[in-house]
Amino acid sequence: MSAFAALKNNPFGESIFNNTSNGDNHSRDDVEEDEVVQYIANSSDEDDDDDNDDNDNDQGNEDNNLFPLEISAPVDTSISSTPAPILNSRITQSNYTPNESNLKFSDNHVTITLNPSEYIIISGQCNLKIIKGSIKINQCHCLTSEDNKSYNIIALQSQSLPIISHYTTPEMEEDGVTSVSIIQLENSFSGIENISQIEPAFKNLISGQPNVEEPSLFKNYSFDIVLTETNGGYGLDINSYWINELNLLKSNKDDPTPKIIMIIGNKNTGKSTFCKSLINELLLTNPNRPVSYLEIDPGQSEYSTPCALSLSEIVQAQFGLAALPHKNNNIVKSRVEHYFGFTSAVNAPTRYVEIIEELFNHHQTKFSQRNHLIINTPGWVKGYGKELLNQITKIINPDKLILLSNNLNQEYPDNANILQDLTYQSLSIIPGVYQLSKYSAPQIRTINKLLYFHQTTTTGTFNFNDHLLDSSPLKISYACGNSPNNPGIYSTTIINHNIDNEFSHRDLCSLVEVSIYGIYSIKSNGNTKFDEMSCFRRDDGNSPFYLNPDDFDNLLSNETITSKFIGLIMVHSINPNDHYMNIYAPDIIINRLRKVLSTNSNQTNDYKLIMIRGEGDIPNCEMLYPEFINKKIDYLKSIKKRKAATTSRKLVDLKLPYISFETKSKVGGIWKVRKNIKRRGHHQKG
């Protein structure tokens, strides 16, 4: 039986939502069938997570820096057979029927009355406020009107949607009192609703596939109530196993000793969902005690900058998508980040472990006496990923290790293999929530990059009405042999690329262009002078200084050096004659860069800006500027129709880099093999 077929059953937990149809027959709009994120039995967790480079390679390679000798690969790479996972109950629509008495419309908000056993699924963006009574979110988080708080919800189709249900408190049950719950949903247009103007594939990211036959009642609002099944959307129904574990973890709210809780498991088991649920429960139970959140999954992070690892101090519950820093100042009090550069630890494992150790040490120094620490790990728990997990648990030694699995027996072969050699104080095994995402992992990472580069600090929103190329890039100078004192970028580094004397530095400009870079600000606190360091390569007069990745790591680990990760920039192009780069970045990052440069102009040139790159891929939708593409297509059409000379409109042939407009030949092109078909002459005559 296939893994997908086995996903139709659910033995885990009871729910008030179980009477609803599972809704298994979902098509995937705008997503090819082979892009769907799904669990495949007996497969490596890294094989299908990324496009090309995230493979579960267990063989050592002495000449490859991807597997440094500091971390040894496992000897035994055998993988036990794994049964197909089981699907958690799927809630695809609300059981709430709107009428004149339970639904009131206003210009900027709607008021909804929920009776006992009623629930709604929310899609889109809104501010939630409880007017009367109590509600439960995702059958787990209890909110009451006495809190007098407003909660911002960003519910995208790339994630499970929040479920809001009526709730009767234990005190009311004892008194035999039944009461309605009244909530208010207020508009909250953040700009994400316009993301399809940049990438049409995300046109249903906010509200799902529209129903042509039954137009939505909420078409003029920033949110929607899912009253009928949408194409691929489902609500988050937390099962009883999770609820029991969450209640156990929050029961010691008065314990002054903070706990370190690490969540592990295969990918697509619900690790991020459990982490956010646990954080919300801890904050709702004790609002005055912040929670530290260590994200070490660079491929599926929410609070972190894309391709970065972070430690966040969270002070308020958040339902749905975790907003970006400028939007959640009241949610995240502080954040420390380090640029990793890739979406998988396989590309730079030693650097990965070193960053985790640095972030954990920061928590131990700043927050260990007060905050609980929740750690979200990647889903790579086999082969070399298992070896990395061993290293991480030795560094952290969590008080509680929670394994999300499809079998609750600790002696089950897969569980035993994962837990072998791990370091922890206590263990819980709970069922994973195996849900298929509507969007593939690469698409979700593209969404995160678009959200990052289109954020606007001044308005606290996202600008998806304009492409980045609609505005001129920012010019920033760089230091080189002919201009060593330029105040801008001092050097550049590409992870896993140590260059030697045979490398032609004239090619460095081409290597740097059209990529996303992390940028650090570094300062020497001692007598060390960067201009005197021999580790910076200054071989070419017009190319940027280059710092090998090993030297970069040594520089940041130097006790006399102070470093800070500023954020991401997108390098558009380089002018080697005038020694400057054209870059794009969010305005919050540009302001940080200007602050560093202004500090250098007022004092000596103490601060240096160093760029570092990992995979560095720019989303295609940012490079394929529609206006240029359309002009090129019009020109090619005019040439094809032989009207270029007679057309009244003069067309210009744009020379666009990185884009091919060559059409496939119908003759001699791709062969399509046809099997078991015989031509008339092939039939034997009796």
Curated annotation (Swiss-Prot):
Keywords of the record: ATP-binding, Kinase, Nucleotide-binding, Nucleus, rRNA processing, Transferase
Protein localization: Nucleus, Nucleolus
Binding site residues for ATP: 265-272
Domain of life: Eukaryota
Extent of Acidic residues compositional bias: 44-61
Region (Disordered), start-end ranges: 1-67
Molecular function as annotated in GO: ATP binding; polynucleotide 5'-hydroxyl-kinase activity
Record-linked InterPro entries: Clp1/Grc3, CLP1_P, P-loop_NTPase
GO CC, any one term: nucleolus
EC assignment: 2.7.1.-
Matches recorded under Pfam families: CLP1_P (PF16575)
GO BP annotations listed: cleavage in ITS2 between 5.8S rRNA and LSU-rRNA of tricistronic rRNA transcript (SSU-rRNA, 5.8S rRNA, LSU-rRNA); rRNA processing
PANTHER family: CLEAVAGE/POLYADENYLATION FACTOR IA SUBUNIT CLP1P, POLYNUCLEOTIDE 5'-HYDROXYL-KINASE NOL9
Family: Belongs to the Clp1 family. NOL9/GRC3 subfamily.
Purpose: Polynucleotide 5'-kinase involved in rRNA processing.
Name of the featured protein: Polynucleotide 5'-hydroxyl-kinase GRC3
Organism of this sequence: Candida albicans (strain SC5314 / ATCC MYA-2876)
